[in-house]
């Protein structure tokens, strides 16, 4: 309920970020999803975009379901996060692009986790390469609206090669 009240006071065309775990997803995943679904619906009605922070890959399918429900062919209202420090993130991003019949909302994050954990890149150089590949893939694909969550100069220079209306 608090999230809906916050959406009511922020200007339309703003973005509201949330996390599944903030809604008790570990205890009640279905209840958390229902609450986020309600917030996404309210946000769309008010013109406020919803960014779902992918603190855990367990929620990717649920995020995709919300994008399918609220995103249109021309505009993304719900965005999910792709953690490019994960070795499988590029494959997941490409799969989502291929199966999306709507405008995919992609928030690209580089991430701080590197190495010594299964499924993560071992070096920052590998993470940078994956992030820059994701920049190229998303910004060159018509049905993707991209948020570049980075301050990395190389990635930002790379993004400037594309039309500004394809990223934020």
What are these regions (language model features)?
Residues 1-168:
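Positively charged, amphipathic and often flexible ligand-engagement surfaces
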């Amino acid at each position: 309920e608090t999230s809906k009240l916050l959406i009511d006071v922020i200007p339309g065309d703003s973005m509201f970020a949330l996390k599944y775990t903030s809604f008790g997803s570990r205890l009640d995943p279905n209840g958390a999803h229902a609450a986020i679904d309600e917030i996404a619906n309210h946000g769309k009605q008010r013109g406020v975009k919803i960014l779902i922070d992918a603190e855990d890959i367990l929620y990717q399918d649920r995020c995709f379901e919300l994008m399918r429900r609220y995103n249109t062919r021309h505009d993304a209202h719900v965005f999910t996060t792709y953690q490019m420090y994960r070795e499988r993130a590029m494959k997941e991003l490409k799969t989502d692009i291929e199966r999306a019949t709507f405008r995919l909302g992609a928030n690209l994050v580089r991430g701080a986790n590197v190495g010594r954990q299964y499924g993560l890149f071992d070096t920052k150089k590998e993470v940078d390469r994956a992030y820059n590949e994701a920049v190229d893939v998303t910004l060159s694909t018509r049905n993707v609206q991209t948020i570049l969550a980075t301050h990395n100069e190389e990635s930002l220079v790379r993004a400037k090669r594309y039309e500004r209306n394809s990223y934020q």
